[in-house]
Amino acid sequence: MKRISYVILASILSAGFASCNYLSIDDYFSDEIKIDEVFANKRNVQAYIWGMTGDLRDEGSLYQYADFPGPLATDEAFTMYGTQFGYNGMKLVLGEISASNPYSFSNVWTTSYQCIRRANTVFARIDEAKDLTAQDRAELLSLNRFIRAYAYYKLWLAYGPVILIGDEEIPSNLDLGDYDRARATNEETVEYICSELEEAAKYLPETYPLMEFGRPTKGAAYGLIARIRTYYASPLWNGGEAARRCFGNWYRKTDRVKYVTTDEYDEERWAIAAAACKRVMNMKKSGAPMYSLFTVQEDTQTPPLPEGVTSDPDFYEPYPVGAAGIDHLRSYSEQFTGEAVIATNPEYVWGRKSQTLVDNTRMGFPISFGGWGGMALTQKIVDSYSMYDGRSIDNSSEAYPYSESGFTNEQKSFSGYRLNAGVYNMYDNREMRFYACVGFSERFWPMSSTTMSGKYNQTVTYYYDSPNGKQNSATDYSPTGYVIVKYIHPNDAWDGDNARRMDKGYPIIRYADILLMYAESLNHLTKAYEIKLGDETYSVSRDLNEIKSAFNLVRHRSGMPGISNNDLADEETFQKILEIERMKEFLHEGQRYFDVRRWGIYEETENETIMGMNVDGSKENFYQRTVPNTSRIGARLVHKKLYLLPIPLNEIRKLPSCDQNPDWES
């Protein structure tokens, strides 16, 4: 029998697939490599299973040819880049996506089912590998089960209820009608994915060696369950107004069963979500917490905490009780820029190295320094960031005032960041996450990796007549006067001698997400619950101290005062606070697209007019709130069908029992 190396086999199995037969598997092997050879031994089986991950796109692909619409399909991003170049989030909001032409979004359907088919082949044939020990078999099957569950999870995020194949191995010689089947209900889908992840977690390791960073762990399985349970408890899937409006008349045509229960609210779902989050929070490694928020200790460049904060009695205590003793800008920023060691970041419940994120830094980088300069943030995002003492821009203090007139008089330096003199006062005195994420006119760009004169330590502006302004390009400019800089390291450069970029990691699940989902879930409880997950039972209730403890870890890490009992006075008040916090904390991580949908506020947020600075003006009239002068603003489509993506029409027509998503063509 032919010897197949891990590298060759993995590369073959990770190749892109173009077949329309979404339940075929043999199409993906050349005549040189037979499926029987895969199960000849342990080594080949391992390579085969890891080859499945090649079907799943780099999760850090947020903007271009992405599996999900991402930031460009929300109120956190806008661009003038041509949609023909794969900016399909813009295609979606401009009404250019259809079931007959879903562009890259069809990848979720085709590649996920390719992955599921492969996993089922492993379940059916793994015993053919005679050199597997019982432990080998258990570990490989757990990994296989996780990958299959993750593929179903991606399908659920994109389309809602899925077609469940179970463990059935699908031969490639079946006629189309032999594998036609209806979609499961939403409840059946969620329960199946979660049960599969629970089973997978039993034999997944808690950690891997550093060289194997990115492989799914027990915590990754538990973290996915926590996210799925939180989404499932949210209004879109749990009797909210959006559920009734979007899914009230959505019945399975094969038996007239409703896909989504829209007329009943189940509070216990929030309790299960809270317990699932708590399980991740309780995980230990050598007696210490398995996961924690990433922090950097303060040093001589760390600015002092803001004075006069009285709303949070713990604020001046050392972190994690309060906000003292850490550098808030670096603690947030360095896990995205590549400064932090990706493989040892304790905040990654599950993460992977992402070359796409490295490449995407070019989208926010100034065009005059080798970038494309057009991945814009909106004024809404800029306004959402608090002042340095945690107050909103509408309620700023005398010590840290907010102003939309005038410019700063002196340069400030803090945490390795330089805030130039002459910066618009709107951008002064803001919280540290603002400086980590927002590129604005008169921002200082270090670009320290290059040694070429004039290519580093530069100030960039977006005035109409500046080198990075609108007059220089029809598409490669910021239509709002802001760009995303969250993933850009001070050393990163795209032009000049020795220009290079730091490696980046993409957090598929961050511990900050677990903490905020936990706080959110507890907030919606009106009584105490005892929830059993595996062998453990978790007691959950709307305990104000528990909510504050989890939520304030995130707040204090960013240098902001924690919430008070007044903020928790009622469920709705805290929900609004949490929505803003998630918008800031997870900016351009792909979370907001799903958040506004699960909360049922997608239409509300999308109906708000995109605004920014006046990029048609020179410096004298640039600094005024303006609707970008582009037809794309008026062309934005807001429709309830956009809560879910369309299943590709060619797949729907091959499967007569499979219903299309509401309001999409079938």
Question: Where does each model-flagged region fall?
Answer:
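Long, intrinsically disordered, low-complexity segments
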Residues: 19-22, 112-115, 192-194, 256, ...
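Short coil/turn linking the two alpha-helices of tandem helical-hairpin repeats
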Residues: 156-157, 161-163, 228-240, 524-528
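Acidic, serine/threonine/proline-rich low-complexity intrinsically disordered regions
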Residues: 172, 179-183, 187, 236-274, ...
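Membrane-proximal, proline-rich intrinsically disordered regions
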Residues: 20-70, 297-298, 425-428, 650-666
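Conserved, well-structured interaction surfaces
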Residues: 37, 42-60, 82-159, 176-218, ...
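Bacterial Sec-dependent N-terminal signal peptides
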Residues: 1-30
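Long, low-complexity, polar/charged, intrinsically disordered or flexibly structured peripheral segments
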Residues: 364-490
